[in-house]
Amino acid sequence: ADLWVLTQGEVDHTSLLSPPLSAADLQDQQRTVTSRAAENLFWLGRYTERAEFVVGVAWLALETLRSASPPVRQWLGEVTERHGLVPEGTPTPTQSLRVFERALALGLPAAAGVTSVGFNLRALVTCAQSLRERLSPDHWRLIQELDDHFEQHMASALAQSAREGGAAPVADVVGVLGRTSTHLSAVTGAQTDRMVRDDGWRLLSVGRQIERLDTLCHALARGLEAGLANSDEGFDLLLGLFDSMITYRARFQGRREMLPLLDLLVFDTDSTRSVAWVVRTLRDRLRKLARHDGAWAYEVTDPLPMPETWSIEQMAALDASGRPAELIAALHRTVDAVRELSSAISNHLFAHVAGADRSVWQ
């Protein structure tokens, strides 16, 4: 029941309720990002990008190996081995294509190990689960379904292979990888358009760009060293890896030349897969992210290259072996620089530096 108190004196209007927010309160409001959340966001970005890359590489390998030339087979074998998609000691595609295909297919589910496609998808789910308050319901559901559908359909494909005598179920696995790639595109779309672009989102983006720069620069450098750009199939493979096939055909119809290829994959600042775009985006977002610690942000990003200042004529110049040696060296230096940057971010910002619940930005 209500209780009314009568008094003859002045009434005290003090209230324990929070006062309404003022315009000044809203203007100064910053969302806190704890060290634990910061690390999870960073790795959510990295696992998303890593999953996209290994799914794409596995798909390209299984789709093209049987008709590929020896240089292309060798490059695909090196890239898949570097990313742990086949066990160490597996015969290369040039040594035994059948054994390599089977090892690649069997190494895709989560149970195969910490570098498998399935493990990366499971790690993506684990990071997302710790960030439920930052993800829309659709975003979270997409990530859950991605992992569940991949494991279910991959297990079905491999079980069918076992019943039929153990041959690599290439067509079935390629189909599963294609659907997984489409599902991952929906996840990255949710990250781009369904998240608030605060400091936490910028850290997620930084993680994605670090992973993208590392994987694409190394793959391109090894592809150029293997002479992939000198053949039609290798040319298409590089464009497919950078998801730039349609863009290249629209701009340079009927041309298969080194200069326009490098212009699109390395120097184009409008293509989200080009080296120049990724480096610039990584640098700008990290500096904006760490604006409260500007000296550190500039110190760790200054060693990153600036591809927009490179000379395309100089970088595309071929040496005696027909390879763009200067560009290859620059790509390897970029890989080294981005790995050092990743270590610097981890050492400076994340929970193992101090208390797990400390604020990184506020």
Model-derived regions, located:
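Alpha-helical transmembrane segments and their helix-helix packing motifs
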Residues: 1-362
